[in-house]
């Protein structure tokens, strides 16, 4: 983990010392960190206590390494997880990236279920990128080259099956987020990956 991620993790560890356990949790990478869930929920009359433990740039290996401060220490009754977008890359595992992701999803669910017996688990589907925005550069397109609709369809099919196998839930909100070519709608994103509040 880089220094920025380490700092966020340290802050979460401090916050977990005073957290009210047994509440609702959203956790994962940037799409969770940038999710203004508490504000949106309050605007809809939802007064539940909701915690956010997302860290931008986090991958699944890092999430598993720090699963206690990011999830288990809070002992949530409901947990919503969106992690793995940063694993859609050939950098570390080559053409085995999808296999590695699915193995990690199983590990995450197994660790939660082994410790939090009554927690309801919701896996949130991966959202496609938009590689056709005017702001895209050769470097950004290269970085996102695997984040195409076909790969997201593959990346979401197996987790849905895994979730069912483990008695968990799978949430796919992409129908309202994608355009005619199954890329992220331009009005919802500022860089082709991360979302404006209107998308949430």
Across the structure, where does each feature detected by a protein language model lie?
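N-terminal cationic-hydrophobic initiation segments that often serve targeting/anchoring roles
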Residues: 71-72, 109, 113-114, 163
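Alpha/beta-hydrolase-fold catalytic nucleophile elbow
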Residues: 82, 124-125
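Catalytic His-Asp segment of secreted/periplasmic serine-dependent ester chemistry enzymes
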Residues: 128-200
